[in-house]
């Protein structure tokens, strides 16, 4: 019987950060799926070609370049719209089971609104991509919305702040199910609503840049969940019988490690998790907002003299609509923080951070990734998987993103080998020791991309992209004899050779 093993060779070179953790040497179950991922806005480029409409990230990056670390934009990115065949070859070389990608809403409906006919060239692009993957035995996992809202919808009614978005998204979802349903068995409705809502409509650090802390983010959360639920029910009623696919929403979360065994620190950890994953996961899996979220926001709203909670209530009908809209549970996880109890912020501070009310930090001894928020602590993966198991009644879990950011651009990314080794080992601990129903793992990212507000500064790909030489003919590429897309020495190849072994 074929199995997949997590056996690692001893590396004969100095690692950028060293791990002393014991590596789990069990086998992944035979049906365990391993894949890689990326998203349309981050790699496709061709921002206004072949009928594609403007997105909120196009507008945000090009009209406010100071909001992007390197003042760049996604106009070209990794040029995958033109070089998709190369991307398919890269996925093939990796030998993975699935490739997670997203559809650019504005490439199907340029203004976001359903029209009599979708954009033919956009449809052809995705059909060619999906069929090529399937022909190679690679299962597409397709995300309908990965942050790139058509700008027209933001201009017309405020995007995710308005209930109008719910039915418009549902129309778009139905079109995608109709067009691509024969090629896709794994559908993701929406990716990381916490980032969409908190960063986009709370702090405003992401597109569309709306600053409305403690108000806009919660309005957005409700509309995102309703849009997801409507899309799920459309698939369930109209397409599931024919296409036999699965549908889920992707939610991201750090692990919040309690600073001590004190009850107040344990409570702080649980509260942080409920405000991050639970805010979106609880309505989908258990119905309604988490109790602690409702209680704290209502209390702080009342103390501030507001007549109603800043967190909009879900009606009985809405709870019924949202609850149960999952065929599996998705988690994007990169990093962990330490948390402890904290003082109560003034009620005039309406931010999500104030509503959570915990102190969080990264211990100095934890290694860092390429960004300031990124700490490396692999046990957080196992702990988070167990929390999801216990909180949501042991669902099937698929890790839909996990990876290490880097800002050196090196091809000798030994630190990434260590990261994947330790995080995958903790996944195996969760499966074999803790009986977590983990069935899939997806590494982010297949190649370097345009990483939103950090632009091209944060490099996280299995393939290095020379963003200055996407033609492959530039001086640097000629001098180094490299393609503009070059495999990093070892992270994924070492994983394939020594982790993803099929033992006969």
Language-model features: locations:
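Active-site region of glycoside hydrolase catalytic domains
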Residues: 20-68, 93, 111-113, 120-504
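Short, well-structured secondary-structure segments
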Residues: 97-104, 139-143
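Cleavable N-terminal signal peptides of Sec/SRP-targeted secreted and luminal proteins
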Residues: 3-20
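Internal amphipathic alpha-helical repeat/solenoid segments
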Residues: 76-92, 110, 118, 122
